[in-house]
Regions:
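Single conserved hydrophobic/aromatic residue that forms the stacking wall/gate
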Residues: 1-15
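C-terminal motif of bacterial Sec signal peptides marking the signal peptidase cleavage site
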Residues: 26-28
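Catalytic cores and adjacent binding grooves of peptidoglycan-active enzymes
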Residues: 38-43, 164-171, 176-256
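Residues within well-ordered alpha-helices
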Residues: 2, 123, 227-228
Length: 256
C-alpha cells in the first residue's frame, strides 16, 4: 500500500513538473516571437505577433526613413551602381508590415523614391489591414540586385538602378524608385518576341503567364479585381497588366 502511495506521489509530481515545464516552454516561444517593438532593429521576414502589433498600434509599424549608412552599404554596387545619378536623399527606406503566405504579420522593407514614400506607405498599410497576402518583401540587394533571382523567390521590391533596355541615358522607373513589383513569381512579365516565341520573367512564372482571366488557381493573382490593383491605381500608379505591347502583371509605376 505504501509503495502504491509513493508511486502515485511520484507520478503526481512528474505531472506537475510537466505542466510547469510546458508552460515555461510556451512562454519562451511567445517571447521569441512577441514583445517586439517597431523601434527594434528592423529585419525583414521576421514574424511579429498580433499582440505586439496591437500594443504599439498599427501605424507605428509603417515608417519612411532616410537611407542610413547601414542600408546604403547593403545597396552599394548592387541596386545602387556607381553611375547612379540619384542622391541618397532622393530615396527613402520603408519599414512596413505585410501578411505572409500563412497570413501572419511579417516585417518587410523597400526602397522607393522619396517623392512617393508616403503614398506607398499608405497603400501597404491598407493592404495589411485588409489581410492582403504578400509572401516576401526584402531589398533586391539580398539577391545581388538580380531581378530574375528576386522574382523567382516571389519577392516584392522597388528601387534597382538600371537604364531602360537599349538605352544608356534613359533610366527605368525602377532605377528611379518609381516602380513597384508585387508577388512577382505569380504575376510575371510577358512579351512576345519577333520570332513569335515568348519572353517571360521570371522564367519560372510561365505557368501563370497565359489565360489568366480563366484561371482561378493562381496564388496572389493581380487583376482588375485585386485590392493591390485598386489601391495603387487610386494612388496614381499605372498597372503593367493594362499595357498592350507586353504584359507586366507584377508592375505598378508612377510619373512625378
Amino acid at each position: 500500500e505504501m509503495q502504491r502511495s509513493l508511486v502515485g506521489s511520484e507520478m503526481c509530481i512528474r505531472d506537475r513538473l510537466f505542466v510547469v515545464s510546458f508552460t515555461i516552454l510556451l512562454v519562451g516561444c511567445d517571447n521569441d516571437l512577441g514583445h517586439q517593438s517597431p523601434d527594434d532593429e528592423w529585419t525583414a521576414e521576421t514574424l511579429v505577433s498580433q499582440a505586439d502589433v496591437e500594443r504599439s498600434g498599427v501605424d507605428a509599424w509603417f515608417r519612411s526613413e532616410t537611407i542610413s549608412d547601414q542600408i546604403f552599404s547593403r545597396m552599394w554596387l548592387k541596386s545602387w551602381k556607381e553611375d547612379c545619378p540619384l542622391k541618397r536623399s532622393e530615396l527613402r527606406y520603408l519599414k512596413v508590415l505585410h501578411r505572409n503566405a500563412d497570413g501572419n504579420p511579417q516585417r518587410g522593407e523597400m526602397v522607393v523614391n522619396a517623392a512617393i514614400a508616403d503614398k506607398v506607405i499608405d497603400v501597404f498599410r491598407r493592404l495589411y489591414q485588409a489581410d492582403y497576402r504578400i509572401e516576401r518583401m526584402v531589398l533586391i540587394d539580398n539577391y545581388d540586385a538580380d531581378d530574375e533571382s528576386s522574382m523567382r523567390a516571389n519577392n516584392s521590391s522597388s528601387f534597382n538602378f538600371r537604364f531602360m533596355t537599349g538605352s544608356t541615358t534613359k533610366i527605368s522607373k525602377h532605377g528611379l524608385g518609381l516602380a513597384i513589383d508585387i508577388n512577382t513569381l505569380y504575376n510575371p512579365y510577358v512579351k512576345q518576341k519577333d520570332d513569335e516565341s515568348w519572353h517571360i520573367e521570371p522564367a519560372t512564372g510561365e505557368p501563370y503567364a497565359f489565360d489568366r482571366e480563366n484561371k482561378t488557381n493562381i496564388p496572389y493573382k493581380i487583376d482588375h479585381n485585386d485590392l493591390a490593383y485598386r489601391l495603387f491605381t487610386e494612388a496614381g500608379f499605372e498597372w503593367g497588366g493594362d499595357w498592350t505591347s507586353l504584359k507586366d502583371y507584377q508592375h505598378f509605376e508612377i510619373d512625378l
